[in-house]
Structure formats: C-alpha cells, structure tokens
Amino acid sequence: MSDRTEQVATSDIPRPTQNLRTRVVSYFPGLAVAVLIAISAQFLSEHYGAPATLMALLLGMSLNFLSESGARTVPGIHFASRAVLRFGVALLGARVSLEVLSDLGVSLLCLVTTALACTILFAIIVGKFAGMDWRLSLLTGGAVAICGASAAVALNAVLPPRQNSDRDLALTIVAITLLSTSAMVLYPVLASHLQFDAKESGVFIGGTIHDVAQVVGAGFAMSEETGQIATLVKIVRVSLLAPTIIAVLIMVTVLGAGAGQKPQKLGQVIPGFVLGFAFLAALKSMGFLPAAAGDVANDLSRWLLLIALGAVGLKTSVKEFASIRPSHVTLALLATAFLAAFIVVGLLWYRG
C-alpha cells in the first residue's frame, strides 16, 4: 500500500505528531460549528426559556451530516466532544464546596446522601433486569440522583468506552431534561398536597429535581425560604458529584471495567480532568478559591459544556434513536419516581 493510500485510509482525526498549527487549522471548522451551536442554544434559553443543554443537543443533532466521514468539520467535532468536554467537567469542581454540608443538618444530610446512593443502585439493578448495559444504567441513575446533564457528562467521561456512548449520553440528557422540566411544574403542587412546610418543601424540591435552574425556579415559586433551602440541598447534591466520580473511577479501574479487561492500578489511569476537578473542589472547600475566580470558572465551565454537548449532538444521528429500546427512557422515569418517593418517605419519617 502506498503512502498516499495509507494516508487516505487513516482517521479524520489528526495524529498527535502533527504540529500545533496543523491541528488548529484542522480543528477550527468543527469547533466553530460547536461554538455557534452553544451560542444559539444560550440565546434560545435566555429569550424563550428553553433548557440550554437540551437546545445544544437538538441543534447539534439537526446538523449531524457535518460529522459524516470525510467532512472537514469531523476533527473539530471530535475535539469538542472529548477534550473540551473534559476541561469543562474539570472546571465543575469550582461549584463544589463541602462547607454547605454542615449547614443542612445531620439527619437531612443523611437523607439526601442515602437517596442519592440508593437511586443509583436502584437504576443499576433495574437496568440489569431489563438487560441494559450497567454503564448506561449507572449513567442514568447518576444523572437523576445528582445534577442532571452535568452529572451525566461527568460520569460518561470516566466510564469505560462503549458502543454508541455519545448517542446514549445525548438520549439520557434529553430524557433527564424533560423529566426535570415536568418535575419543576408538578413537584410544588405535590409538596403542597402533602402539606410540607417551607423547610420540608425545600428539601423535597432540592433533593429531587435534576437541574439547578429548575430547582431554583420551583423553590422560589413556592416561597423565599423554600427557594433558599431548595438551593442549598441542590448544592449538597452537586457536592456529592466529586465522591461519586471517584467511587466510579475506583470501581472501573481497580475492579476492572468489564469482561476481558484487567484491573489496573488507580494511579496509572486517573484522568487529568478528574484531578483538576478534585483540586478545584478542594480549593473551594478550603476557601482558597476567590469568589471572582470561582464565578469565572463556573461561567467558563457552563460554556465549555454547552460547546461539548453541541458536538455530542452533532455526532448523534436522529435515525439512531429509532434503535433505542424504550427501557432506557423507562429507566430514567422509574429512577426519577424512586428518588421522589424516597425523599417523601424520608421527610414523613423525619416529621415524626
């Protein structure tokens, strides 16, 4: 085979040995498309109230043809869906502070923490009975239990690669976003029906709704006190993203990611973005991260994740969704219902 033939047969993704200028030129078209999708998604979110993450995915999926083999945009799309995503996840650490845990109280903190762990375990068990890949079940359970799209992106980045992982991530985010939007409308009504007081309503809203913005919307729609408590509880759930990622990472590296994969030493395989996440979380928790720097990191993380999700959408074909089994969406719905029921029962028991 000639050098020319070999060159044509290689991947659209640039080799690591290529110089920086060649990489930048190669990445630019696809990366520019992903950035434009993120800007458009944010515009739709600000002017029409649509969830930005969902808009980024749907806009990307509508332009899926740009990720077809041979297109000039392929290298940049791949870069955005991997490298940009991981950098955005690392910056999520600036949102995590262990200080908020002490403000909630031991009993309610135990309730929220136990609900998170049990929801993930519930999703894995139900997924196993439904014949689903355990990684997809864990991804779905983690997204429901912790913080929606951000948790899904972070967990997907540390889970072992699998076929159609980008498609599964996209579908998970779509399902979680729609469920969270429904919960924002229905859960305040349910809290009132159960005669929860402001504190109980705040714990219920913050402990069950997936997306941060929707927690804030539902909480403050009930009352100022409920909104503040709901936001605090949601921050606690976000804070638990770090130990969850570490636990998953230990599981897939020390115990082995699956059949045929040998266990590895944890120190050999911890991704740099996980270390960055942990480092920023530690700085935030110890008070060493200035508020201004934290705000910049939060904003940058949000934009990077929007860009990455736009790229994930670009790599996801609408036709592929036809091959999705209903069990995936059903699992997200069941996990959401389980989390809500767990928190309700816990609050009723806590009440006395």
UniProtKB/Swiss-Prot annotation:
It is a multi-pass membrane protein. It is found in: Cell membrane. It comes from the Bacteria. The chain crosses the membrane at residues 24-43, 48-67, 104-126, 136-158, 169-191, 201-223, 235-257, 272-294, 301-318, 328-350. Keywords: Cell membrane, Membrane, Plasmid, Transmembrane, Transmembrane helix. GO terms for cellular component: plasma membrane. InterPro entries: UPF0324_pro (IPR018383). PANTHER family: INNER MEMBRANE PROTEIN YEIH-RELATED, UPF0324 INNER MEMBRANE PROTEIN YEIH. Belongs to the UPF0324 family. This is UPF0324 membrane protein RA0957.
